């Protein structure tokens, strides 16, 4: 890893993002320009947790040699700031795919290229 993995982000599965955008378009007249339409998972996940989920996917296919090696660097992009998303949009849309399921789906799709 490039960093120590402690930085957190609010990851969102691509299909959930598409559904959110579709909902905003379909319900466009419900919103005012100043409404906070934050499209996110509303859950912070550390990079180390993401790496662990990916490692778990490799373990499931017998690739136990895939190990997580955290770096020494700290987050130099967001400087460990936590952005809190406004949940206003959840009156119309909520994400359906958790981080573990999303990673499993992406892993399964990408694995097809190597079979």
Feature-to-residue mapping (PLM):
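C-terminal substrate-binding subdomain of Rossmann-fold SDR/epimerase-dehydratase oxidoreductases
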Residues: 1-115
């Amino acid at each position: 890893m490039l960093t120590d993995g402690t930085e957190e982000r609010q990851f969102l599965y691509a299909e959930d993002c598409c559904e959110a955008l579709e909902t905003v378009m379909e319900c466009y007249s419900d919103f005012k320009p100043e409404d906070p339409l934050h499209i996110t998972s509303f859950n912070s996940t550390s990079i180390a947790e993401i790496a662990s989920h990916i490692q778990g996917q490799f373990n499931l296919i017998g690739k136990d040699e895939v190990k997580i090696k955290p770096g020494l660097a700290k987050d130099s992009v967001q400087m460990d700031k936590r952005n809190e998303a406004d949940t206003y949009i959840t009156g119309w849309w909520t994400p359906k795919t958790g981080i573990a399921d999303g990673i499993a789906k992406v892993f399964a799709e990408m694995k097809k290229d190597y079979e």
